[in-house]
Structure formats: C-alpha cells, structure tokens
C-alpha cells in the first residue's frame, strides 16, 4: 500500500484497458478501509464500487455511504451543515456558485447569496439548507424567524435591515437572479 501521508498527495494510475488500474485502486482502497481510514470513491460506471463493497471488511459495512444519484431514495447532502465555522462553510459554497454561474455572476447576486448563506449557516438546524434560500428571500415570516437571533449589526443584520426597508418590487428585482440560479439546484431532490 501507500503510506497514509503519501496518500494525501496526488496519485495517477495510467495504462491501457485491462492492465489492472481498477484492481490496483481496489487494493489501495481496501487497504485504507482495513486500516480504519476514510475513503471517497467516485465511479460513474459503478463497477469499482460494486467490487469494493463485495470485499469490504464486515466491521466497516455500517460506515459506508453510497451516494447514487439514480436512486429513488437519494442520500441528501447539506453543505450548510458543516462544522462550527459558518463563514468558512459559506465561502466554500459561494465559491462553488461563482464557478457554476461565472457567466452571469454579479455583485448584487453575491451580496444576496452571501447574506442568505451566512444567515442559514449561523442559525443551523433542519431549516438551514440551500432549499430554504427562496423562502428566506420571499417569505417575511420565515425570514423574521431565521434572522431573529442574528447579532451582526455591520454584516448580515445590516443587509436584512436594508432588505426589509425595500419595497416588495425592489426585493423581487434584486433576488430574481439568485432565485433563478438556485432553481436549477433545488428542483432536483438529490441536491436539496
């Protein structure tokens, strides 16, 4: 196997079809599993994952999560349910949005999305998901509930005070680009 410290570096396996690349990966992955280390396997064909699951040590079986986007009961992933550092979590989510929507990204979209993400990440709980952003931006009662405990007069609290002072038409105008971007994600059950 590869020493754990070396496994943190990039590894490339190159060879023609049938030369044993998947078998080598399987051995490395199973060695990590036996050693109690976590492993992430991304396999679009599922062949490697299936082989690994068949050979996985029985004592590790309860620790396995298979994320299959074609499953009728997908495993959800909430990027806002991170550790106790909501700003770091939000920076990561925001960077992903910027990369996804680089062609249509603007200062206002970033401001609205940053305030929304920070609000939800700081509040936590089951309502703090990407799917809650439309309600946060369009439902005054939900927004009051989610912003009630915020104590950041120069940051998100200032954003929400300014937002609440806007007319419904002004609010709709500044949130429309964000809602359009989010719709592409929240419409899919696997991404909620």
Language model regions located:
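P-loop NTPase motor domains
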Residues: 16-19, 24-192
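Hydrophobic anchor at the beta1->P-loop junction of P-loop NTPases
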Residues: 13
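Phosphate-binding P-loop
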Residues: 1-8, 33
